[in-house]
């Protein structure tokens, strides 16, 4: 669905990411949304009520599925430059083909990020990152 961003914006939130998962043999189409000040249950409900009838006519995936709408959570996947920019100052784990890094995200632009930990500051090109997510230290 090409206009998913625009549809979600009608509800006063931003599209963060989508995901297709399989849990207990059931397909789940997840839509993650964000907004300044945090996402409420009402926000999720608005998006779900807007998209459900549209997806009944133009399904986002083939076959039977459940639609879930939620915030990306405190420990969330980072895959786009905008995700990293919005996570400045947070703890991030990133994996490239060569190494794994963990530290505080101290820089993020369209091309690269920088993670700082006790060993120093590590600059990583976003295109080299295979997997990244925020994490909490308890």
From Swiss-Prot:
Keywords: Cytoplasm, Ribosome biogenesis. InterPro entries: Ribosome_maturation_RimP, RimP_C, RimP_C_sf, RimP_N, RimP_N_sf. One of its GO terms (cellular component) is cytosol. It holds the Pfam family RimP_N. One of its GO terms (biological process) is ribosomal small subunit assembly. It comes from the Bacteria. It is found in: Cytoplasm. Belongs to the RimP family. HAMAP family: RimP (MF_01077). NCBIfam families: PRK14639.1. Required for maturation of 30S ribosomal subunits. This is Ribosome maturation factor RimP. It comes from Campylobacter curvus (strain 525.92). The lineage of its organism: Bacteria, Pseudomonadati, Campylobacterota, Epsilonproteobacteria, Campylobacterales. The gene is rimP.
